[in-house]
Each structure stands twice: as structure tokens, then as C-alpha cells.
């Protein structure tokens, strides 16, 4: 028995699990999908089109493309293709019912034939890995005219759909979305350039005052993934700073997948940062009452853990720091570490000319790194306060991005339209769809388009 997560393309909140047997025909899977969604469509199950939700790969230009398996290429048999992670940008937009270029690319490919078994289609023809949790496996495309109820094709719903599309093109399309876990050098440099941020490495000095409290490196287990070792490495961190946590009423919380607590819009910019980090150091009230975690009470720092640290890892940590700084009231710090010989700290430092400076420094000894963390957590998080940290060349003065980022005004001819559409969505989210208001917004949009204003 295998559990597949399926998602209906174009329908918000339509991701659902289906239990099936890999030896069954794809046609049987279609019947199971229809049974799970009897109210969504009424057509024959055989008319559904199914597509594999493959994780994209980057081509030579860095663009995400759909991987294609060629059985004749021996090198392609060495590693299976991966399923689409549920935190990938395309997956997040998919479950929200939004369009995405990569989803379009997947559904433009070859649909799964109903006469084949899942085993044949998944593994023989496409060399996919075994399905697991936190993935999307099958994309479902419902044929036109197969909607469930008469209201699906009513004039009101068509009007709402048009407003949705205008909202997408006039508001959402102007926003650039960066997912922390998908950051790389190209995306990272674009983000830093857009925000006028420059990275400035600073040197370290010999540990003053004797020898730091010894700390062993974390022992990674080769037969387990990073995610499977999340709790052991959280306990490792707590064991090395537990006294300071207790004294300052703090805790270290491991952030679960899907809990995107570092999702935020950059003020004054059409930029959205999305996702999470691995661990957060914050007030211990978040441990007593886990439902407070999204509010990040008393947050002091984030810790991004990578078994192997790469350049992309650095840009991920920077993206997370920017998001946390925007969300948090006080100044914060980020740590990127493999928990062995790479302990890299990042903080918002100052402004130089028209650029915000984020400084970074790296330690290689766990004992020295934990001495820095203990000292940091013992100090006031107030922005602008200088903190002398072990092994740091000079006192650290952390600032807030909100005080340093240049303000950008959204002077645009479409701002009135955008405000009207956003206001419509705010009201609709509380009171439900309003036909008359939708008509008024649509009329305003039409009047703003020269070609259509003649008819309005």
C-alpha cells in the first residue's frame, strides 16, 4: 500500500491523500481520486488527466525545468528523480489554487496512461523515488465542463473568477516571492541588490580569558536525513547553552516543516520572503504554549542547520535573517552551522552610503561558538546596543532593517485599482463574495484600460 498526495490544478485547498496499491492500474487511481472529490466534478473518472509532480532541476541558465528520464542513458539510472516538495514555490501556489509556470510545464507533458500500473509509470518509465510524506505526487487536471454543481458555472462565479485573475495580474504578479529553502547565488544576489544590502565579512580573534568551555562536535548519522536528526541536534544545542536559557527564560524550538513562521512582506517593496528556519531561540512561553510560536515572542536568534554548508546555504540564512528582522521587534542574529566545524554568524550592522551592511564572521570550534551564543543571549536585544562577544574582532552593534532600508514609494498609475481589488478581497474574506462590489471593481478595471473604456 502506498499513500499518494494528489492536488487538483486550479482548485484551492484541493491537496488530499489517496491510499492505493502500486500494482494497481492508473485507471483505478482515477476512480479513487473521483471518489475523494465527488462534489468537485461529476464526469467520468477516465476523463481525468493525471501528471507526475516531479521536483524541478535547473538547466544551464539556472531556470527550473521538468526532468525527463531517458532509460537508454545509464548515468540517469544512478539516482532517482524526486517528487515535488510541499514547500516548493510551485506546490505552495498549487494548493492555493494559483497559477505557476512550473505547474503549467508539468501539465503540458505526457499524462499518465490509465492502462499502465503505477509501478510501471512511476519507476520503470520515470525512475521516481519512493513516495513519502511532505511531497506532492500527482497533479489532477479536471476537463472543462466537469464541474460538480450548477453554481460552478454561474454568472456570479464567472465574475468572481475574473476579479481573481485581475487581482493576480495587478497585485500578485508585481510581487517577487523568495522561498528561503530555494535560495541560491543568483536569487540571493538579486534579493540583496533589490534591498541595497551588502555583506561584509569581519575577522575573528583568539578566544580571550583562557579556554572556552569544551564542546564536542555533533555526530551526524549517515543513515538518517537531516530532518530525521532534527530533535537530536536541537537537544545537542540545548545541552551546550542550557544554563543561559534557564537564566533568561528562553528556549530552543525546532520548527516543523510546513510551519512557515518566516513568511513576511518586505515593507515598501513588492517582495515576499517565505518559509522557515530549523531552530529559533525565543521566550520559553513558546514552549509552554506552542500556539504562541507563530508570534515569535522574545525571539533572539535563528539557527539554520546544514550537514554540508554551501554558498546557497549562506544566501538561505541571509534571507531568513532579513525576514526575522522584519518580523521581530528587537534586533536579532542568524547562525548558519553544520554543528561541527562551521559556525557562521550574521547580523544587521550599519549603513554605509546608500547600502545596508550585514556583517558576518565564522568560527570553527564548537566551544567558541557556544561561548558566543551564551554571551549573546545574556545581553540586551535592544537595537543599537553594543555587545562584546568572544572571538569577535570588535564589539557588535546590531541595528534594525526598518531603520536602515531606504523607503520606496509605490507611485504607480494602477495603485487605485490595486487598492480597490485588495479592499474587495479584505471584505470578501470576512463577509463572503459580494456580487455588486465585484461588478464595481470590474467596472473600474475596465475603465482604466483604454481599449475597454469606450464600452464602460
UniProtKB/Swiss-Prot annotation:
Signal peptide: 1-17
Family: Belongs to the Crinkler effector family.
Repressor is among the record's keywords: no
Cross-referenced InterPro entries: Crinkler_N
Residues the record marks as carrying a glycan: 338
Induction section of the entry: Expressed during colonization of the host plant tomato by P.infestans.
Segments of this protein annotated with the region LQLFLAK domain: 18-54
Organism in which the protein naturally occurs: Phytophthora infestans
Function: Secreted effector that effector that induces cell death when expressed in host plants. Induces the expression of defense response genes in tomato.
Record's protein name: Crinkler effector protein 2
Free-text note regarding domains: The CRN proteins have modular architectures that include a signal peptide, a conserved N-terminus, and highly diverse C-terminal domains. The conserved CRN N-terminus harbors a distinct LXLFLAK motif, which is followed by the conserved DWL domain. A highly conserved HVLVXXP motif marks the end of the CRN N-terminal domains and forms a junction where diverse C-terminal domains are fused. The conserved CRN N-terminus mediates the translocation into the plant host cells.
Entry keyword set: Glycoprotein, Host nucleus, Secreted, Signal, Virulence
Transmembrane segments: none
Amino acid at each position: 500500500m502506498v499513500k499518494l498526495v494528489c492536488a487538483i490544478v486550479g482548485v484551492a485547498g484541493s491537496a488530499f491523500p489517496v491510499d492505493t496499491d502500486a500494482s494497481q492500474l492508473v485507471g483505478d487511481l482515477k476512480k479513487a481520486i473521483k471518489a475523494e472529490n465527488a462534489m468537485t466534478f461529476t464526469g467520468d473518472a477516465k476523463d481525468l488527466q493525471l501528471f507526475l509532480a516531479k521536483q524541478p532541476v535547473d538547466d544551464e541558465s539556472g531556470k527550473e525545468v521538468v526532468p525527463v528520464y531517458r532509460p537508454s542513458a545509464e548515468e540517469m539510472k544512478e539516482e532517482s528523480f524526486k517528487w515535488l516538495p510541499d514547500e516548493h514555490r510551485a506546490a505552495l501556489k498549487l494548493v492555493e489554487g494559483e497559477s505557476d509556470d512550473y505547474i503549467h510545464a508539468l501539465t503540458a507533458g505526457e499524462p499518465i496512461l490509465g492502462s499502465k500500473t503505477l509501478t510501471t509509470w512511476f519507476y520503470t518509465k520515470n525512475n521516481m523515488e519512493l513516495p513519502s510524506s511532505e511531497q506532492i505526487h500527482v497533479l489532477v487536471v479536471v476537463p472543462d465542463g466537469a464541474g460538480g454543481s450548477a453554481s460552478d458555472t454561474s454568472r456570479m462565479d464567472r465574475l468572481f473568477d475574473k476579479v481573481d485573475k485581475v487581482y493576480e495580474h495587478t497585485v500578485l504578479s508585481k510581487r517577487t516571492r523568495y522561498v528561503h529553502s530555494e535560495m541560491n547565488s543568483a536569487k540571493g544576489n538579486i534579493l540583496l541588490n533589490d534591498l541595497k544590502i551588502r555583506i561584509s565579512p569581519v575577522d575573528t580573534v583568539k578566544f580571550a580569558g583562557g579556554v572556552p568551555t569544551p564542546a564536542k562536535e555533533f555526530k551526524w548519522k549517515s543513515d538518517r536525513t537531516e530532518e530525521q536528526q532534527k530533535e537530536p541536534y536541537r537537544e545537542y544545542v540545548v545541552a551546550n547553552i542550557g544554563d543561559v536559557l534557564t537564566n533568561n527564560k528562553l528556549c530552543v524550538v525546532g520548527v516543523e516543516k510546513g510551519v512557515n513562521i518566516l513568511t513576511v512582506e518586505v515593507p515598501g517593496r513588492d517582495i515576499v520572503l517565505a518559509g522557515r528556519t530549523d531552530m529559533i531561540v525565543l521566550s520559553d512561553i513558546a514552549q509552554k504554549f506552542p500556539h504562541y510560536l507563530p508570534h515569535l515572542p522574545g525571539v533572539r536568534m535563528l539557527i539554520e542547520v546544514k550537514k554540508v554548508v554551501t554558498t546557497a546555504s549562506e544566501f538561505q540564512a541571509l534571507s531568513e535573517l532579513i525576514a526575522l528582522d522584519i518580523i521581530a521587534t528587537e534586533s536579532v542574529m542568524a547562525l548558519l552551522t553544520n554543528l561541527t566545524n562551521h559556525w557562521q554568524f550574521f547580523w544587521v550592522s550599519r549603513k554605509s552610503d546608500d547600502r545596508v551592511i550585514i556583517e558576518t564572521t565564522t568560527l570553527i570550534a564548537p566551544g567558541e561558538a557556544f561561548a558566543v551564543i551564551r554571551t549573546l543571549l545574556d545581553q540586551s536585544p535592544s537595537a543599537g546596543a553594543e555587545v562584546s562577544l568572544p572571538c569577535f574582532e570588535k564589539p557588535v552593534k546590531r541595528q534594525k532593517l526598518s531603520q536602515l532600508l531606504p523607503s520606496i514609494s509605490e507611485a504607480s498609475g494602477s495603485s487605485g485599482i490595486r487598492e480597490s481589488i485588495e479592499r474587495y478581497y479584505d471584505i470578501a474574506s470576512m463577509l463572503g463574495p459580494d456580487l455588486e462590489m465585484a461588478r464595481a471593481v470590474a467596472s473600474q478595471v475596465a475603465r482604466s484600460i483604454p481599449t475597454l473604456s469606450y464600452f464602460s
